[in-house]
UniProtKB/Swiss-Prot annotation:
GO terms for molecular function: dihydrolipoyl dehydrogenase (NADH) activity; flavin adenine dinucleotide binding; NAD(P)+ transhydrogenase (Si-specific) activity. This is Soluble pyridine nucleotide transhydrogenase. It is found in: Cytoplasm. It comes from Pseudomonas syringae pv. syringae (strain B728a). One of its GO terms (cellular component) is cytosol. Belongs to the class-I pyridine nucleotide-disulfide oxidoreductase family. FAD binds at residues 35-44. The gene is sthA. The lineage of its organism: Bacteria, Pseudomonadati, Pseudomonadota, Gammaproteobacteria, Pseudomonadales. InterPro entries: Class-I_Pyr_Nuc-Dis_Oxidored, FAD/NAD-bd_sf, FAD/NAD-binding_dom, FAD/NAD-linked_Rdtase_dimer_sf, Pyr_nuc-diS_OxRdtase, Pyr_nucl-diS_OxRdtase_dimer, STH_gammaproteobact.
Amino acid sequence: MAVYNYDVVVLGSGPAGEGAAMNAAKAGRKVAMVDSRRQVGGNCTHLGTIPSKALRHSVKQIIQFNTNPMFRAIGEPRWFSFPDVLKNAEMVISKQVASRTSYYARNRVDVFFGTGSFADETSINVVCTNGVVEKLVANQIIIATGSRPYRPADIDFSHKRIYDSDTILSLGHTPRKLIIYGAGVIGCEYASIFSGLGVLVELVDNRDQLLSFLDSEISQALSYHFSNNNVMVRHNEEYEKVEGLDNGVILHLKSGKKIKADALLWCNGRTGNTDKLGLENIGLKANGRGQIEVDETYRTSVSNVYGAGDVIGWPSLASAAYDQGRSAAGSMVDNGSWRYVNDVPTGIYTIPEISSIGKNEHELTQAKVPYEVGKAFFKGMARAQISGERVGMLKILFHRETLEVLGVHCFGDQASEIVHIGQAIMSQPGEANTMKYFVNTTFNYPTMAEAYRVAAYDGLNRLF
């Protein structure tokens, strides 16, 4: 067994692992990266964020072509199969892998492909993909192994008609009807993708509202948009059993209902990838969801072991994971780059997009904060009329006395980009965080950014 010595070993090359490895390397540490795949990038690049967003982009282009009257001169609406749109996602994945591989090489981070597990608090045994076992010894170790879809034991995921959010990328046909169980972020995003391909979607939600953490008006807008686009949402339903057939699948619900479709996509929960890490060898224990507990510096109960990304739970976003990994390494090497990552924008890539940051109306009402609301509807924006993306709105919540911006919520095209203007103002200290910025600033015209000015005037006009 070959033995290699490092200052830092990072387990997992997703966003959290990458952020950690790069920051530690920039601080002059000798760093090794271990990943169970034969390529870097983690689930985010290969099965999650990147392929699903690439799929969404392709589907959105198809929708634009099929709904724009200008293109009728070219021909009738055209439809593409799921495997067809998947080809573009595969090209994006290859480009991402190439880029990220170059990052590690440029920063002189050694990458080991294989399954890593703790031998003790300072040693990692790596069973490489070629079967060779190598030992990595390090002063400090960061766990960034991510998560995977939760799979109930009573569901046969080997059945050819039953998928989860990892295996759905192997779907070789376009189903006429699809059941999606679980209406969280992943479930809603795939509901948009498949409905955009003309698939009838049954979206089964075990709660009474879609994405209940969102501002209720935004959640309602998504529900309304789904109902107009081949998505049947069923709230307050729980599965009793899943019956796989040769020609489809039947979902039996505890309410007594039965739903039949060509395929089922399971999107109900995720579990941390900790079961093969040998945590018992260092006295560390994961919770029931496979997640490990860390403090505000991302340190676990083992003093030289840190955690970041999905494996530590909330908020389970790629954007936050990268910052958590970078901050964990910053805490570890003490180079001033540590921060506790808690003020994170939400980006949900449905069609149209949803994004938000800060408080929603329910939270402000519960806290008895005197707030006011300003809105800008995209249908009245010149840029939206030009692009044909007229569905959506920008909503700003602000303190009616100090004019401090308290929350920004957006539903519509480019929402995940638009929200960052509000985020930048909300991060300003003291009186610099004010609605006055939006009315005293000249925005390019026509842009979607000027929705902030429209929403600001709308809100300020409500004051008395």
